[in-house]
Curated annotation (Swiss-Prot):
Its cofactor is Fe cation. GO terms for cellular component: cytoplasm; inclusion body. It is an enzyme of class 1 (oxidoreductase). The modification Phosphoserine is found at S33. Fe cation 1 binds at H98, H123, D124, D253. This is Inositol oxygenase. Fe cation 2 binds at D124, H194, H220. It is found in: Cytoplasm. Belongs to the myo-inositol oxygenase family. Pfam families: MIOX. It comes from Rattus norvegicus (Rat). Substrate binds at R29, D85, E86, S87, K127, G141, D142, H220, S221. It catalyses: myo-inositol + O2 = D-glucuronate + H2O + H(+).
Length: 285
């Protein structure tokens, strides 16, 4: 049975995106009419109501022991066969194909960076949370720091946070909230979802990938930062140095999706070799 993760915002709903770019992408990913807009808004209303400091801490404890399943990375990729991410309603195919499409796009543009190819394959594996009963608003969608006031480029920022209890707490309702200026994103509590889960899982299992890879995984859905230009007050110099890598990854994450599905069988040996190199064996999930 396929699990629909529910709608993610497209470019046309992100307030920081160039209108011409949004228009061209909107012709392919239609979020401009029908019931989908209401569903997208509902997803973000739930997310922005319930993603609090307390919620994120509880989820980190719940999943932080990585005791749900023992399996290899390729087995996790295969699990994505059962995930159809409705963020792309015009192209109805499993998320596993998106993993290979992203990886192959990176491979063509950066043939000398095999670790980067692997990040393309890995980046959405955290969506297996949906198979463990997590609601869509706690799995997909744009991410943001909890514990401080949401910034202007957070999608639906002005209309979805009214019922979030943290914004009534003076510790969390200012621009910096519970953080120190330029504390570094490594010290920031991000909203819970597939990015944060996989980032923590990679650390737990000691993936031997460069730090750029960990940044790409953890922050590829952090659109208010890498595209909106917000949350710079929390960034360290290292974060700013890593930002171009996250932006480079984002191009392939967004723009490699198409109905021409890759021949996965022929690609598997190459990517299995990368898995064996950087994250081999049976891992804890």
């Amino acid at each position: 049975m396929k699990v629909d993760l529910g709608p993610d915002p497209s470019l046309v709903y992100r307030p920081d995106v160039d209108p011409e770019m949004a228009k061209s992408k909107g012709s392919f990913r239609n979020y401009t009419s029908g019931p989908l807009l209401d569903r997208v808004f509902t997803t973000y209303k739930l997310m922005h109501t319930h993603q609090t400091v307390d919620f994120v801490m509880r989820k980190r404890i719940q999943f932080g022991s990585f005791s749900y399943k023992k399996m290899t990375v390729m087995e996790a990729v295969d699990m994505l066969d059962d995930l159809v991410d409705e963020s792309d309603p015009d192209v109805d195919f499993p998320n596993s194909f998106h993993a290979f499409q992203t990886a192959e796009g990176i491979r063509k543009a950066h043939p000398d960076k095999d670790w980067f190819h692997l990040v393309g394959l890995l980046h959405d594996l955290g969506k297996i949370l949906a198979l463990w009963g997590e609601p869509q608003w706690a799995v997909v969608g744009d991410t943001f720091p909890v514990g401080c006031r949401p910034q202007a480029s957070v999608v639906f920022c002005d209309s979805t946070f009214q019922d979030n209890p943290d914004l009534q707490d003076p510790r969390y309702s200012t621009e910096l909230g519970m953080y120190q200026p330029h504390c570094g994103l490594e010290n920031v509590l991000m909203s819970w979802g597939h990015d944060e889960y996989l980032y923590q899982m990679m650390k737990f299992n000691k993936f031997s990938l460069p730090s750029e890879a960990f940044y790409m995984v953890r922050f590829h859905s952090f659109y208010p930062w890498h595209t909106g230009g917000d949350y710079r007050q929390l960034c360290s110099q290292q974060d700013l140095d890593m930002l171009p890598w996250v932006q480079e990854f984002n191009k392939f994450d967004l723009y490699t999706k198409c109905p021409d599905l890759p021949e996965v069988k022929s690609l598997r040996p190459y990517y299995q070799g990368l898995i064996d190199k950087y994250c081999p064996g049976i891992l804890s999930w």
